[in-house]
Regions:
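N-terminal membrane-targeting hydrophobic helices
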Residues: 1-120
Length: 120
């Protein structure tokens, strides 16, 4: 889906209440679009760990405008599935990163080919 509002409208159809009941959660999932405006923004929160983080931030449940308690995890799962078709793990994402020298967090002065980490 292209916009958090569309996710929120989908949540309202699925769980009841109004789109505004869910918009904060969906805005949070897509917040990274503000600094990385293509599909790769999803690497930060669109995975199982992101769903559990949303639950820690927003609480285990929210109460929608119909007075129903809705698990935040269900809303997060819906968002990620609508965007990706499944719920990946953070490991699924991170394992696809091509390590770069700067990512190791240390300087490699004096490293020889025998001691250099593989892939560098």
């Amino acid at each position: 889906m292209a916009h958090p509002l569309k996710h929120a409208e989908s949540s309202a159809r699925r769980f009841g209440g109004k789109a505004d009941d869910y918009l904060g959660i969906h805005n949070w999932f897509d917040e990274s679009k503000s600094f990385f405006a293509d599909f790769r923004h999803r690497a930060l929160r669109h995975h199982a760990e992101g769903i559990f983080l949303a639950e820690r931030i927003f609480g285990v449940t929210i109460v929608n405008s119909d007075g129903k308690r809705i698990p935040v995890r269900y809303v997060g799962e819906q968002h990620v599935k609508e965007d990706l078709g499944r719920i990946p793990t953070a490991q699924d994402r991170l394992s696809q990163i091509s390590p770069q020298r700067w990512m190791y967090g240390q300087r490699f002065e004096g490293i020889t080919s025998k001691t250099q980490p593989s892939g560098l």
